[in-house]
Amino acid sequence: MENPVPIKKAVFPVAGMGTRFLPATKASPKEMLPIVDKPLIQYAVEEAVAAGCTELVFVTGRNKRSIEDHFDKAYELETELEQRHKTALLSHVRDILPSDVTCLYIRQAEALGLGHAVLCARAAVGNEPFAVILADDLIDAPQGAIAQMAEVYRQTGNSVLGVETVAPSQTGSYGIVEVSPWQQYQRIQSIVEKPKPEEAPSNLAVVGRYILTPRIFSLLQTVGRGAGGEIQLTDGIAKLLEHEPVLAHAFAGKRYDCGSKLGYLEATLAYGLKHPETAEAFRTLLQKYSQVEV
């Protein structure tokens, strides 16, 4: 096969209301919730950039201006830090995005689901393959999940979904795929959105990472409203299966479901224990609390 076009564009659907974290998300998006000293969306962006993406498309909603501000220049803050000789902090602020990376913000006028959010990015993505990253799913890995999946795409030219095995009782929270061996990969045979455990084709779940060919856009235009009355990306992918191979990639790394309170707290613990400024003292603090009856 000819060498496929490299993945240069990443789409971040960030228009959700974050109701699980109210009232914290009443005026601030859930993607700006911090894990130690960086917001979730920054971890997602860093993963995309590390995979070679240089064009970042944020599909936003109301109350999402802080995401745009976070990735914009902050002249007053930089001047203040420079005057106070806080060079380390100044470097952190200036280096949030490499100079060759550009950001585009598109408003999703109605909350019509993940498939609709991806469709909103069509004009920005054009006729190129692209990544979709859900910031709720924080993945800690030596090589980012999108970089791993981009390598599979480079070898095959096919769409790739990031997957992991979940407990059968959890299938109702995910898109679930059925796979079969294909060359040295796993080809998806079917995909269904949030099935009951007894109706799930497997317990292999799609978890917030996608590399998609541009054909997905025309297919998303044809799907009606699915689960929850929304335009589901899962339904578009189900149609994509009829036209081309779609692969499942069980990425190496630990995923934290930061869309749930418990997953968010677990991520905070894990990242706090390895952060150079907090690791030692935080470990001591946890040992202290572990001795207290709960």
Model-derived regions: residue spans:
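Conserved beta-loop-beta/alpha segment of the NTase-like Rossmann-fold superfamily
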Residues: 69, 77-80, 94-176, 212-214, ...
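Well-ordered alpha-helical segments embedded in enzymatic catalytic cores
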Residues: 40-43, 116-120, 236
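Catalytic-core segments of class I nucleotidyltransferases/pyrophosphorylases
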Residues: 131, 150, 154, 181-284
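Residues at the starts of beta-strands that form the adenosine-phosphate
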Residues: 9, 54-56, 102, 129, ...
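Conserved beta-strand scaffold positions in the cores of enzyme catalytic domains, especially
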Residues: 32, 103-105, 159, 246-248, ...
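Short, conserved catalytic or adaptor-binding loops enriched in Gly and charged residues
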Residues: 91-102, 180-182, 239-241
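N-terminal glycine-rich phosphate-binding loop and ensuing alpha1 helix
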Residues: 2-86, 144-148
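Structural beta-sheet core signal
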Residues: 12, 58, 132, 161-162, ...
